[in-house]
Structures are given as C-alpha cells and as structure tokens.
Amino acid sequence: MKKYKYSSYEIADIGDYLKVFACTAVMSQPIMSIINNMHQSQQTQVGFGILYNLVKYTAPAFIFGILYTTIRTSDLNGHFSYFKHLQKNWSNLFVPTIWWTLIYLLGMPWLQQENKFNSFGTFCWQFINGNAAPHLWYNTMMLQFIILMPFFWSISRYVRNNIKRAFAVAIVTLILYLAWLAFYDYYVFHGVHQNDWYLLDRVFISFFIYAVFGVLAWQFRSYFNEFITKFWWLIVVIFILCFIWTNYELSQFGYPLNFYNAPYYKPSMTFYCLAVICLIAAFCLYQVCKRQINSLRIFHFLAIYAYRAYLANVFWNQLVWRGLNMQYHAKFHPFLTLFGCWLLTWILSFSSAYLLHMWWTKVKKMIARNTHLYI
C-alpha cells in the first residue's frame, strides 16, 4: 500500500481530526449536566437529551484517533520503541494528568465523584481512579491504552496487509465486545453490581474495539479510505438510524432525565460512535483530497493540545459558570447558556493548554540545562 496518496495527508491525519472533534464535543457534556439538573421543563430535558446523545461519541473517537496516529507514525518509521513511546507520552500525557488531577482534588474538591477523600489513602485512591472530577474517568481509561500500546502494535504486525487476518481480528473483536456489553448491561448498568462495579466503565476492555479498529483502519487504509469516501451516504443513514435508536432508548427511562442512562456500553451507542468516527474520517479525507492546507494545519495544531485542553475544560467551566453567574441565565435561557459557556470554555481551555505547554517547555529546558535531567 502507498504510504500517502496525497502529500497534504502529511500535515494532519484522521487521528488529528478525531481528537479535535472529540475534545470540542466533550466540553459540552459537563455543562449540559449542570443545566439539566436545574429542574428544567420536560421539553428542555428532551432537547438536552438529544444534544447529549449527539455528542456522546467522544471517548471512542479519541481512542480510535490515538491508536490510528500512533500506529501510523510507528509504521512509517519502520519500528516501535516502547521506551521512546513512554518517554514522549510521559511529558505529553502523564505529567499534565498529574498536575490537573492535583488541581481538581485540592482546588475544586466539590467536583469529586462518588466519595470524597478524607485521608491520605482515600486521596490517593481518588487520584488514580478518575473520580477527582467528572471527566477524569477518561484519563484513567485512556492511559491504559498508552501503557498497552505494544499489544496493539503486535496486532498491526500480525495482520500487516493480510485481509483475511484483519477480517478475523475484526470479527473476534466485535464478538468479544458485544459479549462484554451484554455482561455490563446485565451486571452493572442498573444491575446488581451497579454501585460496586461502576469502575468497569473505565477499564480498557470497555473501549478496546475502537483501539483495534483504529489499528485496522491504518493498516488497511486503502480499503477503509475508499469505503468511507465512496459510501459516506450509507454511513449517514446508519448514523441517523443509530441516533434515533439511542434517543429512543434514553426516552424509555422517563423523566427527570438522567444522563447516566445514556452510556457508551450499549450496541446502539457502539454503532453510533463507529458511524460518527467514519464520518469525521471522511471529512478529513475530503479536506486532504481538496488540499485545504490551512484547515489541515489548524486541525493538526489543535490536536496537539486537545488532551491538555480536555484536562482543563472542567476547571474553566467552573470558573465561567460561577464567575458569570450562569446559573441565573440557565433558568431563562438554558440553550443559550449552554452554547455561551461551551464557547468560552473551549477558548479558555485551548488557550491555557497552549500557554502552559510553552511555559512547561521553557521550564524543562532550564532544568535540563542546569541538571542534565530529562523531564
């Protein structure tokens, strides 16, 4: 297979677009939760339920994008170095995660999920389990994929360009994942272990299908790219049908609306997320084919800071919400409040991600120059 059909693909890839779309969409979710919990009318709750399901693709898209880009860059380099992989992601992912988790636990302790820490032991547990803030469960899950990257690299080496092996891997992955969803639905989602097994939602197996499919999408990019660009209309149909399906399921739980009843761990949401991923990928390929260089550069730039912006978004969300008295506005204009708070949060999150990265880069250079240590 050709490495690139278009030279413009070297500027930004499908993974970049998925990260930016996912990061942008996910920033709306905590804001919707806050506004929806303010005893809104049923009509408003219906609207928020539809919007929530619309953007409920973010974690799968991010995982797919991370695996796609990592396997792509390693494949083009001709090898995968686990040490260099961890070294790079220690600075890009682990360090920001540590700092932001500390900020949430110490600076905004009211954001903790489930239980609040009351000792050093419970502090450490909240630190690692993703309960320090509403969105940090994803960090706990995503970092598992970073650690397990050699496993997914081995899958890419196993299938290589063998379509039969790829098909077998895809089928086995789908069967295992659907079995996992059935298990989760029976035992955890409103099941007997809803309260004591809830952390299963952030174990890597709950999202591994998107990682495997991200690997296969790169390894068989000629087939994947041709399919999503040629049959984008069919993917749109699947997207609409799955979107209707997810909204129907959520409506069956009645009102007041609870976003807990719209989890990722359902067949409807799985196929919906895969459809959204394919549509975003098709959009990326369209811009690549049209050589829309400026757009590609913008997406690549934003993708670099997407994870850091994600970490910061709830922090800025809280400051915007409290500082601008958004609670008052949400009573009368819930949707305008959502979009206004969303926009401000997005701007502040990406701006702070960029500025903090620039500052941290300078600090590292100073430390390295004085101590000869790598951070």
Question: What residues fall within each predicted segment?
Answer:
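Membrane-interface helix-boundary motifs at transmembrane edges
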Residues: 8-12, 75-87, 154-166, 219-232, ...
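Interfacial loop-to-helix transition and helix-capping segments at the boundaries
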Residues: 49-59, 127-141, 185-210, 247-278
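Alpha-helical transmembrane segments of multi-pass integral membrane proteins
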Residues: 243, 247-362
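Functionally critical transmembrane alpha-helices in membrane proteins and complexes, commonly lining
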Residues: 13-73, 93-101
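Juxtamembrane "helix-exit" motif on the non-cytosolic side of transmembrane helices
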Residues: 34-40, 110, 114, 181-193, ...
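Transmembrane alpha-helical segments and their boundary/interface "anchor" motifs
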Residues: 52-60, 73-107, 117-134, 234-238, ...
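Hydrophobic alpha-helical segments with transmembrane-like composition
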Residues: 104-113, 120-187, 201-211
